[in-house]
C-alpha cells in the first residue's frame, strides 16, 4: 500500500519522509551490500514547490525561487543551485549520466523542448512526458538513472508535474532532487505561460542508508 501525503513545501515533505522511514522502514541490503531502511511506494504532493516566505533560501534564474532548506542540511547555497541547473543542461559534465543530459541530449532528441512544444500546441495534452531509462545501455550498467520519468499536465491554468524514481535516497538526495524538479517545472511553466502548480514525486523504493541513520534520527527530534 502506498504512503501518500500532501505538504506545502519541499522541506516539509523531506522531513515527513525521513520520519516515516526511520519509524516504519524495513531493513534491506542493496546490490552493493549497503544496509538501508526502506518504505515502498511513497507519493508526496508538494502544493507550493517554489516556496513563499521572505526568509527562505533564494535561487535566482529567470524568476526567483524561494525554497526553504532544512536547517543545517548539507544541500544548500551554491551547491544546491548548481545541482538544480543540471536538470536543464544537456551537458553530462564528465558524469556517466545526468538527468538533464538524459532529458535533452542522450536519445538524440530534446525531450524538454518537445514537451514544451506539445503543451503550447495543446494545453490539455497528455503527451508531455519525458523518460531517462535507456534499456540497451542501462540494463548492462551499474550506474543508472534513479529518476525514470517526468510528466507535465496543464490544468486550470497551472502546470502539474509528476516524477517517478525507481530508487530514492531520501536523506541524501530527495530534497535536492525535488528542488531540481521545481527548477525544471518553473522553466516549463514560464515557457508555456502558466503558473507552477503542484509537484508530485513517486518513489518506488524510498530508503535511507545506514551511514545517515544518526542524522536522520536528529531530524525526527526537530
Swiss-Prot record:
It comes from the Archaea. It holds the Pfam family Thymidylat_synt. GO terms for cellular component: cytosol. Keywords: Cytoplasm, Methyltransferase, Nucleotide biosynthesis, Transferase. The keyword Cytoplasm applies. CDD domains: TS_Pyrimidine_HMase (cd00351). Belongs to the thymidylate synthase family. Archaeal-type ThyA subfamily. May catalyze the biosynthesis of dTMP using an unknown cosubstrate. Its EC number is 2.1.1.-. The active site is at 146. The lineage of its organism: Archaea, Methanobacteriati, Methanobacteriota, Methanomada group, Methanobacteria. It comes from Methanothermobacter thermautotrophicus (strain ATCC 29096 / DSM 1053 / JCM 10044 / NBRC 100330 / Delta H) (Methanobacterium thermoautotrophicum). Signal peptide: none annotated. Pathway: Pyrimidine metabolism; dTTP biosynthesis. Monomer. PANTHER family: THYMIDYLATE SYNTHASE 1 (PTHR11548:SF1). This is Putative thymidylate synthase. One of its GO terms (biological process) is dTTP biosynthetic process. It is found in: Cytoplasm. One of its GO terms (molecular function) is thymidylate synthase activity. It is an enzyme of class 2 (transferase).
Amino acid at each position: 500500500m502506498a504512503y501518500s501525503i500532501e505538504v506545502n513545501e519541499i522541506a516539509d515533505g523531506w522531513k515527513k519522509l525521513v520520519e516515516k522511514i526511520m519509524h516504519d522502514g524495513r531493513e534491506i541490503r542493496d546490490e552493493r551490500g549497503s544496509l538501508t531502511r526502506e518504505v515502498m511506494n511513497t507519493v508526496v504532493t508538494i502544493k507550493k514547490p517554489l516556496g513563499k516566505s521572505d526568509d527562505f533560501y533564494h535561487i535566482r534564474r529567470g524568476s526567483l525561487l524561494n525554497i526553504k532548506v532544512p536547517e543545517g542540511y548539507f544541500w544548500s547555497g551554491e551547491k544546491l543551485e548548481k545541482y538544480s541547473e543540471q536538470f536543464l543542461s544537456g551537458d553530462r559534465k564528465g558524469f556517466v549520466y545526468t538527468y538533464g543530459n538524459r532529458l535533452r541530449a542522450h536519445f538524440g532528441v530534446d525531450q524538454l523542448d518537445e514537451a514544451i512544444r506539445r503543451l503550447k500546441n495543446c494545453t490539455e495534452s497528455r503527451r508531455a512526458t519525458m523518460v531517462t531509462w535507456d534499456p540497451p545501455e542501462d540494463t548492462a550498467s551499474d550506474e543508472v538513472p534513479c529518476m525514470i520519468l517526468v510528466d507535465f499536465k496543464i490544468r486550470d491554468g497551472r502546470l502539474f508535474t509528476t516524477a517517478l524514481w525507481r530508487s530514492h535516497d531520501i536523506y541524501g538526495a530527495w530534497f535536492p532532487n525535488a528542488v531540481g524538479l521545481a527548477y525544471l517545472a518553473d522553466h516549463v511553466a514560464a515557457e508555456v505561460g502558466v503558473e507552477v502548480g503542484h509537484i508530485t514525486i513517486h518513489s518506488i523504493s524510498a530508503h535511507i542508508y545506514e551511514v545517515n541513520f544518526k542524522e536522520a534520527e536528529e531530524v525526527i527530534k526537530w
